[in-house]
Design a protein with these regions (language model features):
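Preference for long, solvent-exposed alpha-helical segments and helix-linker "stalks"
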Residues: 15-186
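Bacterial N-terminal signal peptides
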Residues: 1-9
Length: 186
């Protein structure tokens, strides 16, 4: 059961530092429902039942966007898998748009999410944009309204430039591989 409430993350670095998931999802019935949905989507995911994982994942993503950083990694994989298997183009586009929105939402809550993440595991704006560019290029052709190689290239360039500017991390190989492919195709 999904209640009509939406959680909001406040991006204050110290707010969630050192907290556990129970402290970030509230108390009472909402937290019980959210915890149940976390367990349900992870169990379905592990069984590679991505369609079964979708609804409980969506409930967690909507009600508790700062519950766990893994909500975003699992969500990207769940959405990618249901997108690929979906035959109805209207639904396929909706899943694709939801996938792109997942990255926008992660950017919006990045500081709050990073506040309870180990320093070496914290996402940067460049990391998130590069991954969004990868998924746009990989899944967007024939699905995304207004898809273009130039847009994909620009998205990659922004993410990669930010990662390189930051200097703390390397650009993941799969991102570079797709970036080179898009660069060659344009």
């Amino acid at each position: 059961t999904v209640l009509g409430l939406t959680a909001v993350c406040v991006p204050t670095m110290a707010q969630y530092e050192g907290t556990r998931v129970y402290d970030r999802i509230g108390h009472g019935q909402d937290s019980i429902t959210t915890l149940g949905n976390i367990v349900a989507y992870k169990d379905s995911y592990k069984a590679q039942d991505y369609v079964g994982a979708y609804e409980p994942w969506k409930a967690v993503f909507t009600m508790a966007p700062c519950a766990e950083v893994s909500t975003y990694a699992y969500g990207a994989m769940i959405l990618a898998n249901v997108l690929v298997k979906e035959q109805d183009m209207t639904k396929k586009k909706a899943y694709f748009n939801e996938l792109m929105n997942l990255y926008d939402t992660r950017l919006k809550h990045m500081d709050a999410l990073n506040s309870f993440t180990k320093a070496d595991k914290r996402a940067t704006k460049g990391d998130i944009l590069a991954r969004k560019a990868f998924d746009y290029a990989y899944y967007g052709a024939g699905v995304a309204d207004g898809y273009s190689l130039d847009k994909a290239y620009t998205m990659f360039r922004e993410g990669i430039d930010l990662i390189n500017k930051d200097g703390a991390k390397e650009v993941p190989g799969f991102v570079l591989d797709k970036f080179f492919e898009i660069s060659y195709q344009r």
